[in-house]
Amino acid sequence: MTILHMDIETLRNYCINKKGVTEELPFGPDTLVFKVMGKIFALAGLDAIPLSVNLKCDPEKVISLREEYENNILPGYHMNKQHWNTVVLNGHLNPNFIFQLVDDSYNLVEAGLTKKQQQELKDLDE
């Protein structure tokens, strides 16, 4: 299946199917939050037009992504701008690239979990 445009359901399905992920609305009905083992890795503004998602990013890549994808990858809205980007889902970015950014965010957060949390996450497979 080829996806040409990212919508909230596609983004949600991709995020929620990752291991150990829960979804919540802790900041009100307009911000969908995805967590791995209780730690945020993605926030989607449901009232944003166009749809956007905040994703954690390697600090060494954060600026270069913003420069390369100007107007589509921005400093993280209401987030630590050294570690978070806002990715605008307006059809200008390849969905597979967006999925890779989601994966990168998930992996960064997973790597920052305590050893106990990492083991609990690993045990979810068994």
Task: Please place each PLM-identified region on the residue numbering.
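Charge-dense, helix-prone N-terminal extensions
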Residues: 1-126
